[in-house]
Amino acid sequence: MSWFNASQLSSFAKQALSQAQKSIDRVLDIQEEEPSIWAETIPYGEPGISSPVSGGWDTSTWGLKSNTEPQSPPIASPKAITKPVRRTVVDESENFFSAFLSPTDVQTIQKSPVVSKPPAKSQRPEEEVKSSLHESLHIGQSRTPETTESQVKDSSLCVSGETLAAGTSSPKTEGKHEETVNKESDMKVPTVSLKVSESVIDVKTTMESISNTSTQSLTAETKDIALEPKEQKHEDRQSNTPSPPVSTFSSGTSTTSDIEVLDHESVISESSASSRQETTDSKSSLHLMQTSFQLLSASACPEYNRLDDFQKLTESCCSSDAFERIDSFSVQSLDSRSVSEINSDDELSGKGYALVPIIVNSSTPKSKTVESAEGKSEEVNETLVIPTEEAEMEESGRSATPVNCEQPDILVSSTPINEGQTVLDKVAEQCEPAESQPEALSEKEDVCKTVEFLNEKLEKREAQLLSLSKEKALLEEAFDNLKDEMFRVKEESSSISSLKDEFTQRIAEAEKKVQLACKERDAAKKEIKNIKEELATRLNSSETADLLKEKDEQIRGLMEEGEKLSKQQLHNSNIIKKLRAKDKENENMVAKLNKKVKELEEELQHLKQVLDGKEEVEKQHRENIKKLNSMVERQEKDLGRLQVDMDELEEKNRSIQAALDSAYKELTDLHKANAAKDSEAQEAALSREMKAKEELSAALEKAQEEARQQQETLAIQVGDLRLALQRTEQAAARKEDYLRHEIGELQQRLQEAENRNQELSQSVSSTTRPLLRQIENLQATLGSQTSSWEKLEKNLSDRLGESQTLLAAAVERERAATEELLANKIQMSSMESQNSLLRQENSRFQAQLESEKNRLCKLEDENNRYQVELENLKDEYVRTLEETRKEKTLLNSQLEMERMKVEQERKKAIFTQETIKEKERKPFSVSSTPTMSRSSSISGVDMAGLQTSFLSQDESHDHSFGPMPISANGSNLYDAVRMGAGSSIIENLQSQLKLREGEITHLQLEIGNLEKTRSIMAEELVKLTNQNDELEEKVKEIPKLRTQLRDLDQRYNTILQMYGEKAEEAEELRLDLEDVKNMYKTQIDELLRQSLS
């Protein structure tokens, strides 16, 4: 455990804490005012454990609090709307390291006096704070400042990122960590409230107390806190919402942000202007917090890659939820008091993105607190997770972010451990280097893309929610302004009505006065008349003159008064008219304002509905994200299986690749044949289609020519018939006029004859006979004329019948023409169907062209890829060839050297054998000592040379292939030869020769393998060049296909034009036929009328 230096870590944590505190004070511009007030805190611990410092909480108590003290709900004071919660600094290093270190190791950690200065917010009297804390904590021992009213009720216990890091690096700490997590997951551990002081903390006592009572605290917490939701059911909904877990950072310290809590009754009780002012203040404070967080996070985390996403999430969460909370307080009327506390710190864990809440296992049911929190709050909990690689730097940024607590949607409740594990597994596998196969990576990337897409959607939805909430706030402000204007207009209208009443009263009084004046004037006139009458009777005198002057003066005064009154009346009437106009304008304004108010209310309702819809959509998205996380888990399991399968498949793949190469060759041949056949089939189909189109166009032209000829003949016949009809009508009219004239003349003659006859009968009876004869003659002429008339009528009727027959023939011709028209229409419809087929074929060809283009692009890409691979293979081949040549030259040189050495050794061995034989031949004698000494000296020299050669050979073998089995260090070769070691040396040399020969064979085999690879590469090169040639041929064919497509388009357009012309001609023919029919009908009607008349 040399790497785990607790003192260094604690000092680093203290430095990070001090830096974070300085950055907070710098951002929030906190001056060091009244440190004694903030130093005072409540001793909140176990009775058995004595706190080392009287003014602060012992850090051991946050782990053991629930053994002795029941948690009480927070009691809100109705005096202040915003109540800032104390920001506490938790030195968790000693409690955190107690899980890993022994008490002796823990004692080395120095004392960490960590004091946090709160932001200087609205200060209240200490007595109220004392009373509120006495009610909330049931402890009346010491006082607290005004910011300690709201307490952290339910917060989930989170494992810091360094525990995971330590677990991965050392097996001991990993085992302990797993044991603790398993114990806490088997128990029903709900959210644990963390209470921490801000004063100086004695580390030694806390470490001992925590190490002794770590297991007892957890069991007691499970029992005490499991009973809390039953007691909290009577409370309000917002007071029962669980606060998010206090996150434990990597350095072992955490800061809970400043929280502003709104009291509902005080918001409702105050006026609209004050509510607007409060909302603007809260918005400005929220904006300041967000900007400070952005500055600090940007400065503190320069290496954090995904900081932008983190900032977006935090900004969207903070701003949207704050606006929603403010708007809900300003709009809704709540009867009960409720104070919601939210710790906006996010949780940090592991190397990747991970969240480790210690919670109930997936097999055990969920705790009651989670169910009650989910049932009553109905708000979705979100947690932001930051990697622990930059945990120390991030901590300074996070500690400096006083996030506004008015966020009901960012409540982090305790979630089941399987969900946390899914997030851990997912993000850990994202951060790990990609060692798996490309298929698994593609599946992972798809899942990541879907998650990122959903996150982007969520961000967009949150931004929309933000804009809608801002618009809602603006609309509410406008609504309040309009209400104020309404009240002002009502007051003005009431004042105007009062003025109107006053002026009407004045006018009535003036009218009464005018009426009285008129009456007085009338009376005065009567009196003047009477006086004048009296004066006329009496004599003129000075008295009458005086009386008249007085009366004139009275009359003038009355007239002046009447003029003044009339002027006043005019002025009053003008004022009344103006007031009425103003009243009408005010009424119009009031109506307009009412309409605006109604519209704004409707918009508000619509925006509320939209917000509800967006919330539902968000819920759906979160559910989808959960489902995707589960899917990711399944896919990861499948990945593990697939990796095993992949290993098996790779082995199979190697065996199949040889078969695939041959199959590829066959496939290329088949593709070539298929391409040739396809091109032939396409050409044949195109030729057939072109022939069919030409035939259809010829048939159309023929049909059009026949229709034109028939139309011309019909038009000629119609013209002839019209001329004949006109001639017959003219002749008949002439004959009728002539006959009428003759009938008139005859009737005149008859009348004259009758007159004469009467005269003659009266005058002379004798002259009657010739007259009678004349009459008879006249009657005979009349009969002849009538008979001639009848003949004429018969002729006319015959002619009428002929004309009718001609008409019937014309009707039959018309029917034939209509039938031909119908046939033409049928042909046109068939042409249209053919045209549609041609269009479909054209679209199909276009689709085929696009597919061919896509194929071409793909083939070009493949060609480029193959070319790149070819170049790489060529480079590799050249390199391998050069390497093999170099190795070959080296081996050849080594072989030659070895052969030379072997030859030298053989010569030396033969020389030694000869010397040994000579020595054996010579007998040992005393006289031969000088020769012996000489030979021994010679042999010693030779042996020394041999020894040096052997040593050099040993060194060369050491450098090249290995040490020789025989070493001649410290021994004379002559002695070795004398002892019979020459044969062993020769054997060693022979074995070395065999080794060298084996190496030569191995190198030759390698050369053969390389030549085989070269041949394979050459074959692949040939294949790729063939594919490239084919692709180039296809590319050359593309312009031909394009020209064919253009021709087809032109033909299609010409066919469409012809079709339009034919349709127009058919319509013209139909109109002409209708005109002819109408003409025939009118002529027949005229003839029938004439025949009837």
Swiss-Prot record:
InterPro entries to which the protein is assigned, alphabetical: Growth_transcription_reg, TMF_DNA-bd, TMF_TATA-bd
Keyword Coiled coil tagged: yes
Biased composition (Low complexity): 246-257, 925-939
Compartment annotation: Cytoplasm; Nucleus; Golgi apparatus membrane
Any coiled-coil regions, as ranges: 439-922, 984-1092
The organism's place on the tree of life at top rank: Eukaryota
Endpoints of the signal sequence: none
Modification type Phosphoserine: residues: 72, 77, 112, 136, 199, 217, 328, 330, 333, 338, 344, 413, 542, 925, 928, 933
GO cellular component, one term: cytosol
Entry PTM: Phosphorylated by FER.
Keyword entries, A-Z: Coiled coil, Cytoplasm, DNA-binding, Golgi apparatus, Membrane, Nucleus, Phosphoprotein, Repressor, Transcription, Transcription regulation
Residue ranges, annotated region (Interaction with Elongin BC complex): 333-342
Residue ranges of the region described as Disordered: 38-80, 108-189, 229-260, 266-285, 919-939
Domain statement: The Elongin BC complex binding domain is also known as BC-box with the consensus [APST]-L-x(3)-C-x(3)-[AILV].
Summary of the function given for this chain in its UniProt record: Potential coactivator of the androgen receptor. Mediates STAT3 degradation. May play critical roles in two RAB6-dependent retrograde transport processes: one from endosomes to the Golgi and the other from the Golgi to the ER. This protein binds the HIV-1 TATA element and inhibits transcriptional activation by the TATA-binding protein (TBP).
Name of the molecule in the record: TATA element modulatory factor
Species per Swiss-Prot/TrEMBL record: Homo sapiens
